[in-house]
């Protein structure tokens, strides 16, 4: 058998194997969703065989095209191939079908695509997380009860005065009120199959972290904006004293308004300890310039220090745009933790046991007490400030 016939036979056999393996690959994907390692190995071997046969065929074509056997008479590849076939003919009548090696290998599904494995980036890409800051402004405490009661002085009428001998002394008056801060629960849960939690241990820690973050994010909003109705906390903005707009002067900027609010806090005999702003409002204030185009609050360094009028600025999206809160927060309010944020996993929830499901619960219990609401000032920026 001639060299050309041997190459042709090898190519035909490899193509038949490749077709069979492609059929097997399709069947595996439909049944299991993936391709077995053994099948991948077989495909690689057949691919190598086809590559070798193609190389041999190319070399033979070059050899015949160059007329190496008879330098004086160059013949085309088809002529040389015909001569090779005639030499191998045994004199019997028959037909012969010649197939060319024209199946190129590519990355499509019908070719070698299943052999190309995508690179897996480890871990889960997490979205951006908001920095949580409101709790850090407040005093902290722990309680073992479901409610807190405290007595708050409301009005002190101070009539103290100098008194002449034998004269009637003046009487002063103090009014108190009993306040109650009930412990509230913040919670949420997700369900997951036991199989996925067993097969992907990393997923469990990821879910736990996301649940804890979601809890803290809700707490942030409650500490600042809770309206106190139903099971909501009574937040700082709910109990805050309204900003005294009579302090405003013509031409005041937002920075001036914050300065007025700081002064208003001092009227309660306390000192402000922080400023809570929406990030957009802080951005606008930090970029304020004087008449000569110079930055008032330090220019590019303003966002590094987050300081205005000597007080830390707390930019948070929990604060509505156009709203500001200034206060002596550590003296005015206190967070009381009844139960720290915890994560629990249960199989006994509803029909979890028979469905191999897990319920992952995250919750905390806390109360928020406000001792001195006059030390917290809340207001809004005017449209022209």
From Swiss-Prot:
Gene Ontology BP annotations: viral procapsid maturation
Cross-link (Isoaspartyl lysine isopeptide (Asn-Lys) (interchain with K-169)): 356
Gene Ontology MF terms: identical protein binding
InterPro entries named among the record's database cross-references: Phage_capsid (IPR024455), Phage_capsid-like_C (IPR054612)
Effect upon mutating residue 103 to L: Reduced cleavage efficiency
Similarity comment: family membership: Belongs to the HK97 phage major capsid protein family.
Quaternary structure and interacting proteins, as annotated: Homopentamer and homohexamer; isoaspartyl lysine isopeptide-linked. Interacts with the portal protein.
Protein name, UniProt field: Major capsid protein
């Amino acid at each position: 058998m001639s060299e050309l016939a041997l190459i042709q036979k090898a190519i035909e056999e490899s193509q038949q194997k490749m077709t069979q393996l492609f059929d097997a690959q399709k069947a595996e994907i439909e049944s299991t969703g993936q391709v077995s390692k053994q099948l991948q190995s077989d495909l690689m071997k057949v691919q190598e065989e086809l590559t070798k046969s193609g190389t041999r065929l190319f070399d033979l074509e070059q050899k015949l095209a160059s007329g190496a056997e008879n330098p004086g008479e160059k013949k085309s590849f088809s002529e040389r191939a015909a001569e090779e076939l005639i030499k191998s003919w045994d004199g019997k009548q028959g037909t012969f079908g010649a197939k060319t090696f024209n199946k190129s290998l590519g990355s499509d599904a019908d070719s070698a695509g299943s052999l190309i494995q995508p690179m897996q980036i480890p871990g889960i890409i997490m979205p951006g997380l908001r920095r949580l800051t409101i709790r850090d402004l407040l005093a902290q405490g722990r309680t073992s009860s479901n409610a807190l009661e405290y007595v708050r002085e409301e009005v002190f009428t101070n009539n103290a005065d100098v008194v002449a001998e034998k004269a009637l002394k003046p009487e002063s008056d103090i009014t108190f009120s009993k306040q109650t801060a009930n412990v509230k629960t913040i919670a949420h849960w997700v369900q997951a199959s036991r199989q996925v939690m067993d097969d992907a241990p990393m997923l469990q820690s990821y879910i736990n972290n996301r649940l804890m973050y979601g809890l803290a994010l809700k707490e942030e909003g409650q500490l600042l904006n809770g309206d106190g109705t139903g099971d909501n906390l009574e937040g700082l903005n709910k109990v805050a004293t309204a900003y005294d707009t009579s302090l405003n002067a013509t031409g005041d900027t937002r920075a001036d308004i914050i300065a007025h609010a700081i002064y208003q806090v001092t009227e309660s005999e306390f000192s402000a300890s922080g400023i809570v702003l929406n990030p957009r409002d802080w951005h606008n204030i930090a970029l304020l310039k004087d008449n000569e185009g110079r930055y008032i609050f330090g220019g590019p360094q303003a966002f590094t220090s987050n300081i205005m009028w000597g007080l830390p600025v707390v930019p948070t999206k929990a604060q509505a745009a156009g709203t500001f809160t200034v206060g002596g927060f550590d003296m005015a309010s206190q967070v009381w933790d009844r139960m720290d944020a915890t994560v629990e996993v249960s199989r006994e929830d509803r029909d979890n046991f028979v469905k191999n499901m897990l319920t992952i619960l995250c919750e905390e219990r806390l109360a928020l007490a406000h001792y001195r609401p006059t030390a917290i000032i809340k207001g809004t920026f005017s449209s022209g400030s």
